[in-house]
């Protein structure tokens, strides 16, 4: 198994370290445009091998020759969010970046599965899909895994329980229009509605929607990377080990939930083939309408980037 990580910033570098520590590949190639950064970080990680006891080879490069034959391509490259900047503000500047790195990477690894982390997430996943020419099953966005992790964390904090006992699904676009599905939120199998009053549930839903910007506002000069990298690597683990995990991911829908031809967060079965199935769960009218509205927002942004990719 060979994995390429594009972007040696905080998310990419942290994801690379997690991949090698979990020994999910025989080789990981870290790519960045800034000469010296991927090489230095890769060497630093490789030097931790005797301590962490992994044999995965870590290579840093500014080119793509070393990435040839990759099984998975993780795209984290892009400009970061800054305070006061919405994900949509990133649209123009990151479209060109994701377009370029996708074309470079897939020319060397035509059979890979692409996982996109760059923001705005769902739209950048669409860019990678269009520029790669890959089947829809092999292009996936890391959205719902992270959003769900945040929602589960906030619930665990509120109830003072283990996060392991909290189950939830956050669907829709990776942004303010995401849809935390309260109907499927449980703690050790107990519906959240039996444990918290409606106003507290609503507050946690709102905090989950603003989870990314909350961290941006704290950091002032950067954005989240520990939870995003962990979420991406959880997806990689599901693919590498063919686990058939059920995860909320940004996937291309073709009629499910009444949606067509758009990348949006939905429950999927993730295995060695990438998105092996999109699961269609029952949603109440409010959640279904919210999912439709979220998908419409993504579609509007995709229409904008179509002209940028001409």
UniProtKB/Swiss-Prot annotation:
Q: Which domain of life is it from?
A: Bacteria
Q: Which reaction does it catalyse?
A: (S)-malate + NAD(+) = oxaloacetate + NADH + H(+)
**Keyword NAD, does the record have it?**
yes
Which residues are listed for substrate binding in this entry? 81, 87, 119, 150
Q: Which Enzyme Commission number(s) are on file for it? A: 1.1.1.37
* Disulfide pattern: none
Signal peptide residues on this chain, from the entry's feature table: none
Biological process according to GO: lactate metabolic process; tricarboxylic acid cycle
Annotated positions binding NAD(+) = 7-12, 32, 94, 117-119
UniProt keyword list: NAD, Oxidoreductase, Tricarboxylic acid cycle
Q: What does this protein do?
A: Catalyzes the reversible oxidation of malate to oxaloacetate.
As for family, the record states: Belongs to the LDH/MDH superfamily. MDH type 3 family.
State the protein's name. Answer: Malate dehydrogenase
Organism, by scientific name, is Chloroherpeton thalassium (strain ATCC 35110 / GB-78)
Q: Which gene encodes it?
A: mdh
């Amino acid at each position: 198994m060979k994995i390429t990580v594009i972007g040696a910033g905080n998310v990419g570098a942290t994801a690379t370290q997690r991949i090698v520590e979990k020994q999910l590949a025989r080789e990981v190639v870290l790519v960045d445009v800034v000469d010296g950064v991927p090489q230095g970080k890769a060497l630093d990680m490789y030097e931790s091998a005797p301590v962490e006891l992994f044999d995965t080879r870590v290579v840093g490069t500014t080119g793509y020759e070393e990435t040839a034959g990759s099984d998975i391509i993780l795209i984290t490259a892009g400009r970061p969010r800054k305070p006061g900047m919405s994900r949509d503000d990133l649209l123009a500047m990151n479209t060109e970046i994701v377009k370029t790195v996708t074309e470079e990477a897939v020319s060397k690894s035509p059979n890979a599965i692409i996982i996109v982390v760059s923001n705005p997430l769902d739209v950048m996943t669409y860019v990678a899909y269009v520029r790669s020419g890959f089947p829809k099953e092999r292009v996936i966005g890391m959205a719902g895994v992270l959003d769900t992790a945040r929602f589960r964390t906030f619930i665990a904090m509120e109830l003072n329980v283990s996060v392991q006992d909290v189950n939830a699904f956050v669907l829709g676009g990776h942004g303010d229009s995401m849809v935390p599905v309260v109907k499927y939120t449980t703690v050790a199998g107990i519906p959240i509605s039996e444990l918290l009053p409606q106003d507290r549930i609503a507050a946690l839903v709102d905090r989950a929607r603003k989870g990314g910007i909350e961290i941006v506002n704290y950091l002032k000069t950067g954005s989240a990377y520990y939870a995003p990298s962990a979420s991406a690597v959880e997806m990689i683990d599901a693919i590498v080990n063919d686990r058939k995990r059920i995860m909320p991911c940004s996937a291309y829908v073709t009629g499910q939930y009444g949606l067509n031809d758009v990348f949006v967060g939905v429950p999927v079965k993730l295995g060695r083939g990438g998105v092996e199935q999109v699961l269609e769960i029952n949603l109440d009218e409010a959640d279904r309408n919210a999912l439709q509205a979220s998908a419409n927002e993504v579609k509007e942004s995709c229409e904008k980037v179509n002209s940028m990719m001409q």
